[in-house]
């Protein structure tokens, strides 16, 4: 998993509340068991004018020019600004996979659905909760200032605006540790690799009948 320490990136404003996981990555794209290939279909029903299908050549599909991610000024955005209850709906880890592969490192919103919130941390995507007032002010500033960037410092738990104002956010200490060090569930387990090997060795010696090759 990619570590997250500090990031400065262009902000794209998604001015919609209650964005659910089927809108983030529609159900027809969930057939793949790989973690890659979802970025081109992020917000598929909003980005394109036709109905997308798996393994389709998206370069030939008609774009919805009114959708924010298709605007020239937001090309290359790596911070998504959203409204309340982002990531609601059914549980699908493909949602943070799609956001990550598109290029987003963080999503800022007043609130998130619990499962999406948890899945994001496990996949290197930082969800940041700010107050309604702070988010509203960010929407106004992004709209008024092309090329608007934010700097996110995870260690300091701070979001710095271009005008120098700092917005602080809360994060669980364990999740912070994992993101700073790029540790997903597998990475955490592998930290105890030697202890696991030692236990397995003792277990095999004490109960050899449990192992076919003993």
Swiss-Prot record:
It is an enzyme of class 4 (lyase). It catalyses: (2R,3S)-3-isopropylmalate = (2S)-2-isopropylmalate. It comes from the Bacteria. Pfam families: Aconitase_C. InterPro entries: 3-IsopropMal_deHydase_ssu, Aconitase/3IPM_dehydase_swvl, AconitaseA/IPMdHydase_ssu_swvl, IPMI_Swivel, LeuD. Coiled coil: none annotated. GO terms for biological process: L-leucine biosynthetic process. The keyword Ribonucleoprotein does not apply. GO terms for molecular function: 3-isopropylmalate dehydratase activity. Its EC number is 4.2.1.33. Pathway: Amino-acid biosynthesis; L-leucine biosynthesis; L-leucine from 3-methyl-2-oxobutanoate: step 2/4. Signal peptide: none annotated. Keywords: Amino-acid biosynthesis, Branched-chain amino acid biosynthesis, Leucine biosynthesis, Lyase. One of its GO terms (cellular component) is 3-isopropylmalate dehydratase complex. The keyword Plastid does not apply. Heterodimer of LeuC and LeuD. Catalyzes the isomerization between 2-isopropylmalate and 3-isopropylmalate, via the formation of 2-isopropylmaleate. PANTHER family: 3-ISOPROPYLMALATE DEHYDRATASE SMALL SUBUNIT (PTHR43345:SF5), 3-ISOPROPYLMALATE DEHYDRATASE SMALL SUBUNIT 2-RELATED-RELATED (PTHR43345). Belongs to the LeuD family. LeuD type 1 subfamily. This is 3-isopropylmalate dehydratase small subunit. It comes from Pseudomonas putida (strain W619). The lineage of its organism: Bacteria, Pseudomonadati, Pseudomonadota, Gammaproteobacteria, Pseudomonadales.
């Amino acid at each position: 998993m990619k570590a997250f320490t500090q990031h400065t990136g262009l902000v794209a404003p998604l001015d919609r509340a209650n964005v659910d996981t089927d809108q983030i990555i529609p159900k027809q794209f969930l057939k793949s068991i790989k973690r890659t290939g979802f970025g081109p279909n992020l917000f598929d029903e909003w980005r394109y004018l036709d109905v997308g299908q798996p393994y389709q050549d998206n370069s030939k599909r008609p774009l919805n020019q009114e959708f924010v991610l298709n605007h020239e000024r937001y090309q290359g955005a790596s911070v998504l600004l959203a409204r309340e209850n982002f990531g609601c709906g059914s549980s699908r880890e493909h949602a943070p996979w799609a956001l990550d592969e598109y290029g987003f490192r963080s999503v800022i919103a007043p609130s998130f659905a619990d499962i999406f919130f948890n899945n994001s941390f496990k996949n290197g995507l930082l969800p940041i909760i700010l107050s309604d007032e702070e988010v509203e002010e960010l929407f106004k500033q992004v709209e008024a200032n092309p090329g608007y960037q934010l700097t996110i410092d995870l260690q300091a738990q701070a979001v710095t605006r271009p005008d120098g104002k700092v917005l602080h956010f809360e994060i669980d200490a364990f999740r912070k540790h994992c993101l700073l060090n790029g540790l997903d569930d597998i990475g955490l387990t592998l930290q105890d690799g030697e202890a696991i090997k030692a236990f397995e060795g003792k277990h095999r010696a004490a109960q050899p009948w449990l192992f076919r090759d003993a």
